[in-house]
C-alpha cells in the first residue's frame, strides 16, 4: 500500500469509536495500528521537519497577520495569502514523493459487519470507508 493510504487509515482508526464491535475485531484494529505506527510516526516526524525547514524567515509575521486578518489591508491580505500558498506548495512538493512510497504492512482484515458498525457508530459518511479500506 502507499504511505498516504496507511497514514489516512492509521489516523481514522485512531479516531474511531469501536465499542459496538466484537472483541476479536477490536483486537484486529489494535494490531493493525501497531503494525502501521512506525510508518505513520516516521512520516509525521518527516512532515514536521519539512514544515520547519521550509518556514520563511517572516513566518511569525505571516501567522500574526492571519490572527488579525480582519484588520489587514487588501494588500496585506494578498501578500499573506501569497506567502502561505508558496510555503504550502514547498511543503506539499517535498512530501509528495514520501507519501507515494509503497510500504509493506500485514494487517488482518475486518469482517463486513464491522465496517458497517464502525460507519454507523462514528456517524461517518460512506466515503470515509475509503480511508480504512486497507483493513476491509
Predicted stretch roles:
Residues 1-136:
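A composition-driven surface/loop motif
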Amino acid at each position: 500500500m502507499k504511505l498516504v493510504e496507511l497514514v489516512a487509515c492509521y489516523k481514522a482508526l485512531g479516531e474511531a469509536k469501536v465499542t459496538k464491535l466484537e472483541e476479536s475485531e477490536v483486537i484486529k484494529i489494535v494490531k493493525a495500528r501497531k503494525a502501521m505506527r512506525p510508518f505513520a510516526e516516521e512520516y509525521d516526524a518527516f512532515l514536521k521537519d519539512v514544515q520547519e525547514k521550509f518556514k520563511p524567515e517572516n513566518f511569525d509575521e505571516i501567522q500574526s497577520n492571519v490572527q488579525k486578518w480582519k484588520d489587514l489591508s487588501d494588500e496585506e491580505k494578498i501578500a499573506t495569502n501569497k506567502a502561505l500558498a508558496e510555503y504550502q506548495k514547498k511543503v506539499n512538493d517535498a512530501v509528495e514523493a514520501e507519501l507515494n512510497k509503497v510500504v509493506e504492512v500485514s494487517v488482518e482484515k475486518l469482517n463486513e459487519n464491522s465496517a458497517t458498525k464502525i460507519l454507523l457508530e462514528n456517524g461517518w459518511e460512506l466515503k470515509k470507508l475509503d480511508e480504512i479500506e486497507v483493513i476491509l
